[in-house]
């Protein structure tokens, strides 16, 4: 079972990825983790990637595709894999197809932008312990204070509203076209495309996922 998971930052992909991995015994392949592992292992592609990254440049699609092919040939991918954060663009999706990497299911978790902004910009963290609160969904007993220590809570830079909106803008510009792309691939009968409402409870989304991934 070869799966691609699409969705904006904050849509709940990580939680559902965990569910899929546990339910179906397939590894989650994140390009970031894969790059780090290849660099650490000192593989030819890893060394090439390190050279590019050390120069402060972006790793090319060809190099990433090479790493993906190398990774999915490993034993733990025998039953399939879950690609997270890749492909991000249509050229990357084209390159995957050209390299014979076929996909069984493309899953989109759809959450409106305003809901994502509310979810992410409402997060508060206790820097000392890493405890996470939310002003709406999981508020501390005393506003702005950690329940255990009474110390001030902070907003992570990634959760600042302006940052969240910027990341959403990049997602819509780069990744949203993939929704249309894979819709066409599915219409041609070459993959299955599933769209889920990510504003539902985690359990409801997991249940719906399980019903289509049988």
From Swiss-Prot:
Pfam families: ADK, ADK_lid
InterPro entries: Adenyl_kin_sub, Adenylat/UMP-CMP_kin, Adenylat_kinase_CS, Adenylate_kinase_lid-dom, P-loop_NTPase
SUPFAM superfamilies per UniProt: P-loop containing nucleoside triphosphate hydrolases
Keyword Cell membrane included in the entry's annotation: no
Compartments in which it is found: Cytoplasm
Binding of AMP, residues: 31, 36, 57-59, 85-88, 92, 156, 167
Region named NMP: 30-59
UniProt EC number: 2.7.4.3
Catalytic activity: AMP + ATP = 2 ADP
UniProt record, GO biological process: AMP salvage; nucleoside diphosphate metabolic process; nucleoside monophosphate metabolic process
PANTHER family, per database record: NUCLEOTIDE KINASE
Record-stated family: Belongs to the adenylate kinase family.
Function: Catalyzes the reversible transfer of the terminal phosphate group between ATP and AMP. Plays an important role in cellular energy homeostasis and in adenine nucleotide metabolism.
Subunit structure: Monomer.
Protein name per UniProt: Adenylate kinase
Organism: Shewanella oneidensis (strain ATCC 700550 / JCM 31522 / CIP 106686 / LMG 19005 / NCIMB 14063 / MR-1)
Gene: adk
